[in-house]
């Protein structure tokens, strides 16, 4: 049995869960999220009101999907109650970020500013010219936008310049030594 998959997902007060076959819809104070669970996996509610994810047999694919499905359902519940935030920072001379309306405008050493538009359900906040955060209720969207922004100027292994997650340790390389 999957150790993660067999744990029930607790549903806090103020969260409404609707299960219709393979579709799970979670509505909470921050919004609504939907998920379609893969075919052999079943989702139901137990007597305590918690969400239980079960699998029909112990085939390898079903074992893999069991833990995954439980985690995805848990992420829905966390998203509509607390939301997700990724904090990022910029290192480098002249590298900065500013908020233009609901979009982020980056100066990353290119000949032009780079503008990232906020997709639906994602909000940007700028704490300083070198620190900003990405928030939303969908964990996948927040992570994907964060990765896309980091890819604009990956941290350089020699000088450490670029966009990185807050607290991320960059493996530094030693430069060439002169004679």
Swiss-Prot record:
It holds the Pfam family Ribosomal_L6. InterPro entries: Ribosomal_uL6-like, Ribosomal_uL6-like_a/b-dom_sf, Ribosomal_uL6_a/b-dom, Ribosomal_uL6_bac-type, Ribosomal_uL6_CS. The keyword Ribosomal protein applies. One of its GO terms (biological process) is cytoplasmic translation. Keywords: Ribonucleoprotein, Ribosomal protein, RNA-binding, rRNA-binding. It comes from the Bacteria. GO terms for cellular component: cytosolic large ribosomal subunit. GO terms for molecular function: rRNA binding; structural constituent of ribosome. NCBIfam families: L6_bact. This protein binds to the 23S rRNA, and is important in its secondary structure. It is located near the subunit interface in the base of the L7/L12 stalk, and near the tRNA binding site of the peptidyltransferase center. Part of the 50S ribosomal subunit. Belongs to the universal ribosomal protein uL6 family. This is Large ribosomal subunit protein uL6. It comes from Mycolicibacterium paratuberculosis (strain ATCC BAA-968 / K-10) (Mycobacterium paratuberculosis).
């Amino acid at each position: 049995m999957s150790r993660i998959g067999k744990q029930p997902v607790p549903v806090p007060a103020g969260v409404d869960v609707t299960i219709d076959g393979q579709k799970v819809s979670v509505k909470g104070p921050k919004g609504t999220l939907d998920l379609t669970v893969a075919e052999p996996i079943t989702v139901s509610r137990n007597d305590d009101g918690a969400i239980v994810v079960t699998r029909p047999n112990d085939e390898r694919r079903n074992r893999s999907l069991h833990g995954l499905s439980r985690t995805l359902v848990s992420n829905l519940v966390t998203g509509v109650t607390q939301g997700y935030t990724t904090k990022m920072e910029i290192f480098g001379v002249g590298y900065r970020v500013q908020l233009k309306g609901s979009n982020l405008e980056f100066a990353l050493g290119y000949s032009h500013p780079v503008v990232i538009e906020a997709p639906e359900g994602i909000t940007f906040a700028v704490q300083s010219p070198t620190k900003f955060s990405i928030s939303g209720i969908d964990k996948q969207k927040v992570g994907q936008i964060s990765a896309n922004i980091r890819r604009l100027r990956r941290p350089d292994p020699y000088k450490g310049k670029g966009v990185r997650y807050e607290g991320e340790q960059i493996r530094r390389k030693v430069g060439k030594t002169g004679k």
